[in-house]
Amino acid sequence: MRFVIVTGLSGAGKTEATRSLEDLGYFCVDNLPPKLIPKFAEACVQSEGKIDKIALVIDIRGGIFFDDLFESIEYLKANDFNYEILFLEASDEVLVKRFKETRRSHPLSPDGRIITGISEERMRLRELKDRADNIIDTSNYPIRNLREKINLLYGDGKPVEQNLSITVLSFGFKYGIPSDSDLVFDVRFIPNPFYIPELKPFSGEDEPVKNYVLAQEETKGFLSRLSDMAEFLIPNYIKEGKRQLIISIGCTGGRHRSVAIANALYKDLLCKNFHVTLEHRDINEDINRGDRKL
């Protein structure tokens, strides 16, 4: 079990850091009273491995309860919990700018100057910062870079291309475009096996249809360009912190052409070491509905 205590200065990026940890599979709890950490830790142990990565956001918002944090940390240490403290900070200038941009007051100076609250918070958090395992100064960190840093420190060591979950999805336009699609490709320009009597009963997963679709010159040109486009887009999506990508391939009924093309794209991405899954949404939909217009 791995505990990460996320703390630091208000406005330094704890929310974004927590989102990044959540994307990495951490069970995240925001603003838990520090005194409850021991009980929470024991509850996680009793989950029997169902909760094995935890991120607790603890900051000055806890008010008088914040002073209980050190006692709780000692409890974790005494009971051999694998815990780490992540401390986020930024320069006064950057913090003031962020507060002004969001039109928020500082929690330690709700009716006064922002800089006064920042100075007070720095003083109160000095000891906690000294105990931190990792300190990140976000003054010059774009969100993308912070995500990369969090992944480097607290990820599971997967290659960067494995941090984006890709789904290749075939569908039929007659049943609607999948609403969660990121990229949609229309392959109805490819000759349709439906109109060839000996191919009509099969699907794009069967060799006769697959061989027919992939042998078309239109298919070869399309797959070549699609492969190049995916190879260009995916690393850029990863850099921007995107965690899920749905690539939808559509034909008329979602049984022949889109299935064969989706299978080919899936294999191509798999060979390039991307984390990819395959789904054929409408492959049997026409049969189930008794509609043979594919």
Swiss-Prot record:
<keyword id="KW-0547">Nucleotide-binding</keyword>
<dbReference type="GO" id="GO:0005524">
    <property type="term" value="F:ATP binding"/>
</dbReference>
<comment type="similarity">
    <text>Belongs to the RapZ-like family.</text>
</comment>
<comment type="function">
    <text>Displays ATPase and GTPase activities.</text>
</comment>
<dbReference type="InterPro" id="IPR053930">
    <property type="entry name" value="RapZ-like_N"/>
</dbReference>
<feature type="binding site">
    <location>
        <begin position="59"/>
        <end position="62"/>
    </location>
    <ligand>
        <name>GTP</name>
    </ligand>
</feature>
<protein>
    <recommendedName>
        <fullName>Nucleotide-binding protein CPE0354</fullName>
    </recommendedName>
</protein>
<keyword id="KW-0342">GTP-binding</keyword>
<dbReference type="InterPro" id="IPR005337">
    <property type="entry name" value="RapZ-like"/>
</dbReference>
<dbReference type="Pfam" id="PF03668">
    <property type="entry name" value="RapZ-like_N"/>
</dbReference>
<dbReference type="GO" id="GO:0005525">
    <property type="term" value="F:GTP binding"/>
</dbReference>
<dbReference type="Pfam" id="PF22740">
    <property type="entry name" value="PapZ_C"/>
</dbReference>
<keyword id="KW-0067">ATP-binding</keyword>
<dbReference type="InterPro" id="IPR053931">
    <property type="entry name" value="RapZ_C"/>
</dbReference>
<feature type="binding site">
    <location>
        <begin position="8"/>
        <end position="15"/>
    </location>
    <ligand>
        <name>ATP</name>
    </ligand>
</feature>
<dbReference type="InterPro" id="IPR027417">
    <property type="entry name" value="P-loop_NTPase"/>
</dbReference>
